[in-house]
């Protein structure tokens, strides 16, 4: 609480004292102790590297069905890959995270259908890489990249992420070969 006092005089119409409630959120050096909103504020200010280091983790809890697999309160760590990586192309003031540790062990999220060509955690639903990463089943359907974090595709990994994390996600441009099928190193294939 802050109280502002006005000096005596007649050149104002303000009350002699005014009390205001103020809420201050200060980031801590322990990444996991911060809310995703606080992490986003620090990131947007370009100060992430002043508080945290590459490898620091923040626990998230996955809940929901992703394709045919149901996550039920699975705690997984998101960890910092870097700060302002490739900022000239991807934008400044970003903290880059990767999901995939339980404790300190790297894990891959996958279902029992990975060896089938059905609707599981697969790159594509047929034995092809046609369309490259941009049109892949993994990107559009499993990960849910065909919608936005605040309105995720149903039954996608994006929808299984905590809402407070999805609320602060920022778009980042990643350059990938979106044509596939062995087209070679051709500049126009990269988008």
Task: Enumerate the language-model features and the residues they cover.
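C-terminal edge beta-strand
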Residues: 16-26
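Enriched for extracellular/lumenal, surface-exposed ectodomains of secreted and cell-surface proteins
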Residues: 4-18
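N-terminal non-cleavable signal-anchor helices
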Residues: 5-7, 23-25, 173
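Extracellular/surface recognition and adhesion modules
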Residues: 1-4, 20-22, 80
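Long, domain-scale functional regions
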Residues: 27-191
């Amino acid at each position: 609480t802050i109280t502002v006092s006005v000096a005596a005089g007649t050149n104002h119409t303000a009350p002699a004292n005014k009390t205001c409630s103020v809420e201050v959120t200060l980031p801590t050096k322990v990444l996991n102790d911060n809310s995703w909103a606080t992490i986003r504020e620090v990131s947007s200010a370009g100060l992430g590297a002043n508080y945290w280091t590459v490898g620091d983790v923040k626990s998230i809890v996955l809940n929901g069905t992703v394709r045919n697999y149901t996550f039920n309160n699975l705690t997984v760590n998101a960890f910092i890959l870097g700060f302002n990586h490739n900022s000239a192309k991807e934008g400044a003031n970003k903290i880059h995270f990767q999901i995939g540790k339980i404790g300190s062990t790297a894990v891959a999220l996958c279902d029992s259908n990975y060896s089938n060509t059905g609707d599981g955690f697969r790159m594509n639903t047929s034995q092809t890489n046609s369309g490259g990463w941009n049109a892949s089943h993994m990107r559009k359907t499993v990960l849910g990249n065909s919608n936005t974090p605040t309105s995720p595709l149903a039954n996608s990994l994006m929808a299984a992420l905590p809402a407070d994390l999805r609320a602060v996600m920022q778009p980042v441009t990643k350059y990938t070969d979106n044509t596939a099928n062995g087209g070679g190193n051709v500049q126009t294939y990269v988008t």
